[in-house]
């Protein structure tokens, strides 16, 4: 079932091999799919990914990948979470915000002026994806994560860790972000 439509399934004869065990929860998958599509429409985004993980066990409860088709509707075309090669920027934004929250420098309603979506940070231009449309202006941390604002996250980290970058690195290490996952 994808986007409330049942797809044709091609039955193939079973082949002996290993058992596959999934941790996907169909109810959570449906909720995540609806939430992702709602946000994709709200943001007029081309594609998006939502993954829900049980942090206590590491079990993936939902993995939703939606891409806008030529007709303007969203479809699950491929697993973007594992197939697209990209910099870890947006993932790292969440970790960066978590460090600043844990260090009690910010709260979810802390506001940052992202200006017109483009700012000069130490001689380099930092841009939000929509800078050519005027950016976001003043937004809170929740909105910074929602729209994946480069300017917002960078401004927070620069303001609170500029004089002590090691404290930021230590915060990331508290999350074991520097440890291998040993998935192989």
Predicted regions and their residues:
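Beta-lactam-recognizing serine transpeptidase/beta-lactamase-like catalytic domain environment
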Residues: 2-11, 24, 48-86, 98-184
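Conserved, well-ordered alpha-helix/loop/beta-strand core segments that scaffold catalytic motifs
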Residues: 4-48
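Short alpha-helical catalytic segment bearing the HExxH-like zincin motif
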Residues: 90
């Amino acid at each position: 079932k994808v986007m409330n439509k049942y797809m044709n399934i091609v039955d193939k004869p079973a082949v002996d091999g290993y058992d596959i065990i999934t941790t996907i929860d169909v109810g959570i998958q449906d909720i995540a799919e609806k939430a992702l599509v709602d946000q994709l429409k709200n943001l007029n985004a081309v594609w998006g990914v939502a993954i829900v993980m049980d942090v206590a066990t590491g079990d993936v409860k939902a993995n939703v990948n939606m891409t806008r088709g030529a007709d303007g509707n969203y479809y699950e075309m491929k697993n973007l979470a594992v197939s697209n090669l990209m910099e870890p920027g947006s993932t790292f934004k969440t970790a960066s915000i978590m460090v600043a929250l844990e260090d009690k420098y910010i709260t979810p309603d802390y506001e940052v002026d992202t200006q017109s979506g483009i700012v000069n940070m130490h001689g380099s231009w930092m841009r939000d994806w929509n800078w050519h449309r005027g950016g976001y202006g003043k937004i809170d941390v929740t909105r910074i994560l929602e729209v994946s604002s480069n300017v917002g996250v960078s401004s927070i980290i620069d303001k609170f860790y500029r004089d002590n970058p090691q404290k930021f690195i230590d915060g990331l290490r508290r999350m074991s972000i520097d440890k291998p996952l040993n998935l192989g």
